[in-house]
């Protein structure tokens, strides 16, 4: 039901910014986002030439697979959350103020994120071709456990959305909002864009 409603939204946002010239492969990636009383709803739409989902355990390095990511900072305290998913919905959730002090969340907290994958739940090695997949997420506000968020209406968060694949045949790093670092690094809250819940 959530997936179908996100499909019906009039606006999809593209993850299409290439920030690092040595990584010039760009898959087709977009997302739809909405919110409810206690959840953020997010759906990624991906079309790429290389696809992998080998990680099956919570908090494994899913960025080494085909990976979609949502980094979000709910308040101006410098703390952000990085939610990273492979095509079968395996999730890494970290939180901190930088890459250096980021800590993994408790798997019990992560288990509250509802996930629906078009790729099923079984792991697979790299596939090649003209490959399409989607991932729908329902992220409860309690996942943002450093912050006491009661509701979203009227709130403004800072965020960025990413697609990567560190260990694919052709690695790639694509962003929604531009990132101005010399090398690929998504842990850059100063380059987050604005996310308004109207």
Task: Map each language-model feature to its residues.
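Structural preference for beta-rich elements and adjacent junctions enriched in aromatics
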Residues: 1-198
């Amino acid at each position: 039901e959530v997936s179908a409603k996100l499909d019906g939204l009039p606006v999809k946002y593209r993850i299409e910014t290439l920030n690092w010239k040595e990584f010039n492969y760009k898959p087709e990636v977009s997302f739809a986002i909405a919110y409810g009383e206690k959840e953020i709803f997010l759906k990624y739409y991906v079309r790429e030439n290389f696809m992998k989902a080998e990680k099956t355990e919570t908090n494994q390095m899913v960025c080494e697979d085909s990976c979609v990511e949502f980094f979000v900072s709910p308040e101006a305290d410098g703390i952000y959350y990085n939610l990273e998913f492979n095509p079968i919905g395996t999730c890494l959730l970290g939180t901190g103020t930088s890459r250096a002090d980021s800590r993994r969340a408790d798997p019990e907290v992560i288990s509250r994120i509802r996930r629906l994958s078009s790729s099923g739940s079984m792991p697979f090695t790299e596939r090649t071709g003209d490959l399409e997949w989607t991932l729908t997420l329902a992220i409860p506000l309690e996942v943002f456990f450093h912050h006491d968020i009661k509701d979203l209406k009227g709130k403004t968060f800072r965020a960025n959305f990413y697609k990567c694949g560190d260990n694919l045949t052709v690695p790639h790093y694509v962003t929604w909002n531009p990132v101005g670092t010399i090398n690929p690094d998504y842990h850059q809250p100063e380059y987050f864009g604005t996310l308004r819940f109207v």
